[in-house]
Amino acid sequence: MQHKIIHLHQTASTNDYLRALPSPQDDSMTVVYADWQTAGRGQGSNKWESEAGKNLLFSILVCPTSIDITRQFVLSMAGALAVKAALDKYTDGISLKWPTDIYWHDRKISGTLIETSVKGRTLARCIYGIGLNVNQREFHSDAPNPVSLYNIIGVETPTEQLLDEIVQHFDHYYSLAVGGHSDHIVSQYHAALYRREGLHLYEDTSTGEQFSARIDHVSVDGRLHLALSDGTRREYTLKEVRFVLD
């Protein structure tokens, strides 16, 4: 898969930058990364804390026209697996926290904001906005559990090298997704899920109720299916439930 990589010293948001570009006319990806984002964001109204030049702040634009809108979360799975595969080269303990966060043990090293546009029953465009803590040593926001690759391994990692590795893995997993091999992606995603085994504490964000459950599976539309300790089952979409962290 051909890809074009654009480097910016500063931009408001790499997602915004790609959103303004026309869709590629062929089967290719466009990647833009910035040393600094003035308006980088995470899910909802969350802001992404990043020291200038220390981390990877990048977005990927693809046109997955073969993906039905009911199965679009497969693309989220593919993107998460690409980041995990790159990080696995440097450390163990990497897992995927539903829906799109990357964790090292109980600490967040990466997050993804995904934006899609639809044409009929299929996706026209998909933009992955990814923040990955690479060489930042200290964090000062009120985020509860950030960690960087430097915090884990004790040495700095060239950000462009890590980006190239992520793009290579993304090419692999994205090709599986659009090529009709999503079962392979789904099985790998489930095997890598954070808190995949055993009962853990969750909170229903609409009621405030806390309950113990284990992850049963994540469906291709992105719903988290939980099996509760009392034998009942529930399913949640984004922001309807949160993991209660120690």
Give each language-model segment a name.
Residues 4-5, 94-96:
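Generic structural signal for residues in well-ordered beta-strands
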Residues 26-27, 53, 97, 122, ...:
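A generic fold-level signal
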Residues 1-89:
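N-terminal lobe of the biotin/lipoate ligase/transferase fold
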Residues 65-70, 74-94, 104-246:
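Long, positively charged amphipathic alpha-helical accessory segments at protein N-termini or as interdomain linkers
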